[in-house]
From Swiss-Prot:
It comes from Escherichia coli (strain SMS-3-5 / SECEC). L-glutamine binds at D67, Y212. One of its GO terms (biological process) is glutaminyl-tRNA aminoacylation. This is Glutamine--tRNA ligase. SUPFAM superfamilies: Nucleotidylyl transferase, Ribosomal protein L25-like. The gene is glnS.
Amino acid sequence: MSEAEARPTNFIRQIIDEDLASGKHTTVHTRFPPEPNGYLHIGHAKSICLNFGIAQDYKGQCNLRFDDTNPVKEDIEYVESIKNDVEWLGFHWSGNVRYSSDYFDQLHAYAIELINKGLAYVDELTPEQIREYRGTLTQPGKNSPYRDRSVEENLALFEKMRTGGFEEGKACLRAKIDMASPFIVMRDPVLYRIKFAEHHQTGNKWCIYPMYDFTHCISDALEGITHSLCTLEFQDNRRLYDWVLDNITIPVHPRQYEFSRLNLEYTVMSKRKLNLLVTDKHVEGWDDPRMPTISGLRRRGYTAASIREFCKRIGVTKQDNTIEMASLESCIREDLNENAPRAMAVIDPVKLVIENYQGEGEMVTMPNHPNKPEMGSRQVPFSGEIWIDRADFREEANKQYKRLVLGKEVRLRNAYVIKAERVEKDAEGNITTIFCTYDADTLSKDPADGRKVKGVIHWVSAAHALPVEIRLYDRLFSVPNPGAADDFLSVINPESLVIKQGFAEPSLKDAVAGKAFQFEREGYFCLDSRHSTAEKPVFNRTVGLRDTWAKVGE
């Protein structure tokens, strides 16, 4: 299969293929232009994979440009976080990081050009009046009384705006297009507004800042972008994108193409709603493992490869749709099943004593991966007192229960066959200790007399156990579309985080943050980067061994 045949196909790539074949473009140049006012989420990952992936596949370039035109909401913290997320996902931008603020001088000059052409004017309507004059989807707007000012007056007033002669909200620069346009975005949109705020890149040089629609298209043109890719909500804005470039003196005119945004079940993508979750402390921060942010997914244990694979599978279309959470979980589950070393941890422990076991203990050999001998093996301590999971023992059970039952046998993973003889309980009737015997001739082999022992359970030697905190993360919301609820906070899943105190095999004391393990028979976990200590490691559940929500959706 050729390199071209191996590429994913979608309507954007078909457009690029046609542009290259016709000679319209000889190279491909894309960009990823986030606003640095929050943390990137899984929806941004789709755009990152699309823009950087196209540049990679067509041996072109992709710029990282920060759309930093609103200093009130932006911060250098977000700039650094976004750069880190892009690199973590496995992509590299072309040349230096770019900022829309790099072009503030040129943007100002282009605004003056529009004024000189009679295509922009300074308006002194209040923001509320501008909204009122704009009209509705069914009613045309009406002209501002300031719309027909002379070029000279507009130039003088725009300079007054630039030098701080107006208070915030008292004046703005608007394009002069058509207040009766069926597209509200074309009804004399605001191009510049006043903000007396220090900018993280330009300091206090400016007190007027360009709007997104004016900045975006000019920045694309100045950078030589060939294909400007954005989500469907900007479809109508393409008319303004083209209008600006058609009416200024600029040699390059990129084209904008829209694709559907990523909607994912059981979460929200709105920056406002995500911010509310953080500020109201429903989660512990933007990197909370339940958040759809890239930093949250990373802390939970998602790999960059699994997110890239997810973006590849969902594809690029023009139709909005909602992706099942199971699709994302299946990508990380497949990745970790293939690549994560195995380990044993008991999440809900109960003591098990092997009464006929002699000696202080021994080491048993365990493979790090059952299907990958190249991943090697490890030595795990075994002793006469172990921890097993409470769910792995019953005093009575039916034939479908393949774990330890009173009076019956089960195999301990990679160790011996044991038989439950009796139990000890506390005053409330809870089992505190299970007493067993073991068959000393069954270390990693079947009983000599040929009897069949079907069940296998995991365990941890009590004398060598590493105390661990286990954080069982689940979906943040209890309904597939929380954004549709009257109050999305009312459908937060109360069991989205369950904290357990358990025990793990001692090899896990060397675990590093972000490194994934399969806790045998439990799921995939990674060491938490925020709360773990040498004395008390904290492990986050990334995903279960199987989709436990499958029946919920049926």
